[in-house]
């Protein structure tokens, strides 16, 4: 993205909107959209929010720093986090097990399987909106987890099924990664 931004004046680039289906059928119509350097400048940095997906294969009691021992039922977990800078480094940190414990999620990560992470690159702060949206579809939440600096009830949500296979989850992802860009072009 950075290389593109540096060289974009030398490139004849276009932005297109097309209808897609879950089957990835060939689109019957493509519409060119107005382009905006502002969108690239505001949305392409190494910052933003992320959805970290973990899996626990059985119920576990885990010591979470100063919060003490907490119960985590078997299942999938989605943690909502943010990085005002160094998003890629934060995501890389969550992939690995050996690290200094800093955040609540670091403790749970030591006991869980890494499934994936979904970055949402933006300079806007969607962390709390994401937490609210995910809480609406989650099977349970871990109260007070990862939200000591805000008024959210939680930033960690549990699912019986892999959330990547849940249509409502992928719709939230789509809304925050793609559809949110409509605000730049709506009249």
Positions of the model-derived regions?
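Cytochrome P450 catalytic domain signature, combining two hallmark sequence patches
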Residues: 98-103
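GIY-YIG nuclease catalytic motif and its immediate N-terminal context
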Residues: 13-96, 118-125, 163-187
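Function-critical acidic carboxylates
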Residues: 97, 109-110
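Residue- and microsegment-level detector for short, conserved "hotspots"
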Residues: 156-164
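Mid-chain, well-packed structural core segment of small domains
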Residues: 111-152
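Residues that flank catalytic or metal-binding motifs in active/ligand-binding sites
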Residues: 48, 75, 104, 113, ...
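Extreme N-terminal basic, low-complexity initiation segments
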Residues: 2-13
């Amino acid at each position: 993205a950075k290389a593109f931004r540096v060289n974009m004046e030398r490139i004849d680039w276009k932005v297109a909107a097309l209808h897609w289906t879950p089957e990835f059928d060939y689109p019957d119509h493509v519409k060119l959209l107005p382009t905006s350097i502002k969108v690239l400048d505001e949305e392409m940095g190494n910052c933003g929010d992320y959805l970290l997906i973990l899996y626990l294969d059985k119920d576990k009691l885990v010591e979470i720093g100063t919060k003490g021992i907490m119960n985590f039922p078997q299942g999938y977990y989605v943690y909502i986090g943010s990085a005002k800078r160094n998003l890629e480094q934060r995501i890389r940190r969550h992939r690995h097990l050996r690290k200094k414990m800093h955040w609540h999620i670091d403790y749970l990560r030591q006991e869980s399987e890494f499934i994936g992470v979904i970055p949402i690159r933006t300079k806007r702060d969607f962390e709390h909106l994401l937490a609210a949206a995910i809480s609406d579809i989650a099977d349970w939440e871990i109260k007070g987890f990862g939200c000591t600096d805000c008024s959210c009830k939680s930033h960690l949500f549990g699912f019986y099924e892999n959330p990547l296979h849940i249509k409502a989850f992928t719709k939230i992802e789509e809304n925050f990664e793609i559809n949110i860009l409509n605000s730049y072009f709506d009249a």
